[in-house]
């Protein structure tokens, strides 16, 4: 399972003109399930993402996670958006192959599971809409962007 996380000062996702999720300072996470992923990959990815230290401490060092981004226990927002294109195979030709991505059914199930677990673990979780054409706007703070991946079993 893959997450492209971006430290943002604000982010919003809209579908057909209506806002489905919006946060202030926090993380925008573009999330993709790969073929062979299970709930175990979702759990590991979420744990890593919530504890990944990308926010600055009092000394200006990237040392704080989204769950404690102000250094006093204050959590930032988390905007989770599905994006199957993160699993694209771009190694040959000029057109990406999406064979490595999970099927739409598995992707929907694992995205739903990921969001459910995120909401159980974090106070401010907003989302996009799985499978919809979305417009995502953000102000990347830094910019700070990281690619996190927990590979499917047997596929390092």
Curated annotation (Swiss-Prot):
A Pfam family the protein falls into: Tyr_Deacylase
Gene3D superfamilies listed in its UniProt record: D-tyrosyl-tRNA(Tyr) deacylase
GO molecular function annotations of the record: D-tyrosyl-tRNA(Tyr) deacylase activity; Gly-tRNA(Ala) deacylase activity; Ser(Gly)-tRNA(Ala) hydrolase activity; tRNA binding
Residue window of motif Gly-cisPro motif, important for rejection of L-amino acids: 142-143
Keyword RNA-binding among UniProt keywords: yes
EC number: 3.1.1.96
One GO term of the biological process aspect: D-amino acid catabolic process
GO CC aspect terms: cytoplasm
Catalytic reaction list: glycyl-tRNA(Ala) + H2O = tRNA(Ala) + glycine + H(+); a D-aminoacyl-tRNA + H2O = a tRNA + a D-alpha-amino acid + H(+)
Protein location: Cytoplasm
Keyword entries, A-Z: Cytoplasm, Hydrolase, RNA-binding, tRNA-binding
Protein family (similarity comment): Belongs to the DTD family.
Domain text: A Gly-cisPro motif from one monomer fits into the active site of the other monomer to allow specific chiral rejection of L-amino acids.
Record note on quaternary structure: Homodimer.
Function: An aminoacyl-tRNA editing enzyme that deacylates mischarged D-aminoacyl-tRNAs. Also deacylates mischarged glycyl-tRNA(Ala), protecting cells against glycine mischarging by AlaRS. Acts via tRNA-based rather than protein-based catalysis; rejects L-amino acids rather than detecting D-amino acids in the active site. By recycling D-aminoacyl-tRNA to D-amino acids and free tRNA molecules, this enzyme counteracts the toxicity associated with the formation of D-aminoacyl-tRNA entities in vivo and helps enforce protein L-homochirality.
Name under which the protein is recorded: D-aminoacyl-tRNA deacylase
Organism, scientific name: Cupriavidus pinatubonensis (strain JMP 134 / LMG 1197) (Cupriavidus necator (strain JMP 134))
